[in-house]
C-alpha cells in the first residue's frame, strides 16, 4: 500500500516490511499551528477549522538514499491538561520538531521554559529541530494590531536562530502551513536529522536552516 499523501493512524502501512518507519513527533504550545503544519504537508491541504489535538498520527512515504521509508508524523496536544498523556507518544521517537508561532511571543518563551525541559526529561538523547510557524501572519494587519495592543511585535528570523543556539537545537527553520512556504524544508531537515543527527555549524541566512552541533 502506498501511504503517500493523506494517510492517518488508520493506515495499515506499518506492516510493510520493505519500508522502515521513521518517527517524528511535533510539540509546542496549543494553537501555534502544529496540526496545520502536519496536515498541510501530509494532505497538501490547509485545515479550515481549528480543533485542539489530543493525539493524531499521519504517515507519508519518503525516499532517502534511494530507499523508501515511512515517515510517521505524530501530532500532540500543547495544553497543560495533557501534560501526563502527551509523553505516552514519545517512546521510539527519532526526531522532535519543537514549534512556536512567530506571532505568539509566549509560545517562543515556552520553548525554553516548558518544551525543552520536558523533552530532556523524557527523551534526552533524541535530537530536536526548532520550527517557527505562521510566518504568513508577520504582515497580517489584524495580527499586527493585536500584537501592538499587547505592546508586542512578531518574532524575527534572528530570534529563532538565537533560541535554537540557546537550546541546542540542530537547526532553526520557519514556515507557513497556509502558503506552504518553507514547509517541505522542515520535513526534509527532520529526515536529515534522523540519519545525520550531528551537524557542523553553518552560517545562517534567512530562509535556510541554522544547524549546530548538540
From Swiss-Prot:
Alphabetical keyword list: Angiogenesis, Cell membrane, GTP-binding, Lipoprotein, Membrane, Methylation, Nucleotide-binding, Palmitate, Prenylation
**Covalently lipidated residues, kind S-palmitoyl cysteine:** 3, 11
Quick one: effect of changing residue 35 to N? Dominant negative mutant
- Output one GO BP term: actin filament organization
Mutating residue 11 to A leads to what result? Answer: Impaired localization to the plasma membrane
Cell membrane among keywords:
yes
The entry's propeptide annotation covers 212-214
Q: How changing residue 30 to V affects the protein? A: Causes constitutive activation
Q: What is the effect of changing residue 79 to L?
A: Causes constitutive activation
Where it mainly occurs, coarsely classed, is: membrane
The chain residues annotated with the modification Cysteine methyl ester are: 211
- The residues listed in the UniProt record as binding GTP, with positions renumbered to this chain, are 31-36, 46-53, 75-79, 133-136, 177-178
- Assembly information from the UniProt record: Interacts with the CRIB domains of proteins such as Pak1 and Was/Wasp. Interacts with GLUL.
Q: What does this protein do?
A: Plasma membrane-associated small GTPase specifically involved in angiogenesis. Required for endothelial cell migration during vascular development via its interaction with GLUL. Elicits the formation of F-actin-rich structures, thereby regulating endothelial cell migration.
**Family membership:** Belongs to the small GTPase superfamily. Rho family.
Protein name (Swiss-Prot/TrEMBL): Rho-related GTP-binding protein RhoJ
From the UniProt record, report the name of the gene that encodes this protein.
RHOJ
Amino acid at each position: 500500500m502506498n501511504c503517500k499523501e493523506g494517510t492517518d493512524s488508520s493506515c495499515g502501512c506499518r506492516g510493510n516490511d520493505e519500508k522502515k518507519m521513521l518517527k517524528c513527533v511535533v510539540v509546542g504550545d496549543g494553537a501555534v499551528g502544529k496540526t496545520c503544519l502536519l496536515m498541510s504537508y501530509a494532505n497538501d491541504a490547509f485545515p479550515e477549522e481549528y480543533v485542539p489535538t489530543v493525539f493524531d498520527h499521519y504517515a507519508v512515504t519518503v525516499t532517502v538514499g534511494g530507499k523508501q521509508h515511512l515517515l510517521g508524523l505524530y501530532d500532540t496536544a500543547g495544553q497543560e491538561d495533557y501534560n501526563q498523556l502527551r509523553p505516552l507518544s514519545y517512546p521510539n521517537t527519532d526526531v522532535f520538531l519543537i514549534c512556536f508561532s512567530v506571532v505568539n511571543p509566549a509560545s517562543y518563551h515556552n520553548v525554553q521554559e516548558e518544551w525543552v525541559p520536558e523533552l530532556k526529561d523524557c527523551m534526552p538523547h533524541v535530537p530536536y529541530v526548532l520550527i517557527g510557524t505562521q510566518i504568513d501572519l508577520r504582515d497580517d494587519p489584524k495580527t499586527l494590531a493585536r500584537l501592538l495592543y499587547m505592546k508586542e511585535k512578531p518574532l524575527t528570523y534572528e530570534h529563532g536562530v538565537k533560541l535554537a543556539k540557546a537550546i541546542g537545537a540542530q537547526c532553526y527553520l520557519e514556515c507557513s502551513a497556509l502558503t506552504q512556504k518553507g514547509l517541505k524544508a522542515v520535513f526534509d531537515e527532520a529526515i536529515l536529522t534522523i540519519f545525520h543527527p550531528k551537524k557542523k555549524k553553518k552560517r545562517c541566512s534567512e530562509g535556510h536552516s541554522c544547524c549546530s552541533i548538540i
